[in-house]
Amino acid sequence: MGNIMEEVKLEEVAEISSGLVLNRFSSDQEKEGEEYLYITLKSVEDNKINLELLECMNMERKVQERYILHKGDIIMKLAPPFSAALIDFDLPNLIAPSNFAIIRIKKDFDAEYLSFILNGKLIRRQLNRLVEGTILTIIKISYLNELKIKQRDKKEQIKYAKLLSLFLKRRELKKRILKLEEQLMNNILSNL
């Protein structure tokens, strides 16, 4: 029989806030302002952020520190499919818009592990129950605070995070191989 793990609410292990409402800070592109990069909905997939899909914006005033993303933060889409991703890089002036939640670890939890958990089926089921029957399937920060996750030993979390990360890398490599084989096949066929 497996050991019984204590469940904790997400708000107990992380500080959760909404991203920045961009149009309150934006300026005309011709005007001088501080330049910021922001995460787009399409840039978040499979627990990763595609840096090529980030957008750039000039801000007429300085953005508060709480909106600036740092290595170790997690962002989560507030609309389906509710994808989460770990910020595993350093990039100055990176912000998340208001259609994302910013999740910062405040307790004995591994950020990478938590990002995988947030993308898991158990969390998806909890989120789907919370938005059931509503016309707009946008989750509120208060919903995220109530999500229940299993408390594990931090060493165990790190082991699971490494394992899951390896699976993701392996899947990504397989996708690349398939793409290269497709290109190779097309090159051969075009020369026949």
Model-derived regions, located:
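Sequence-specific dsDNA recognition surfaces
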Residues: 11-26, 42-71
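Short, surface-exposed loop/turn microsegments at beta-strand edges and helix-strand junctions
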Residues: 28-36, 55, 67-69, 86-98
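A structural connector/turn signal
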Residues: 63-64, 90, 134
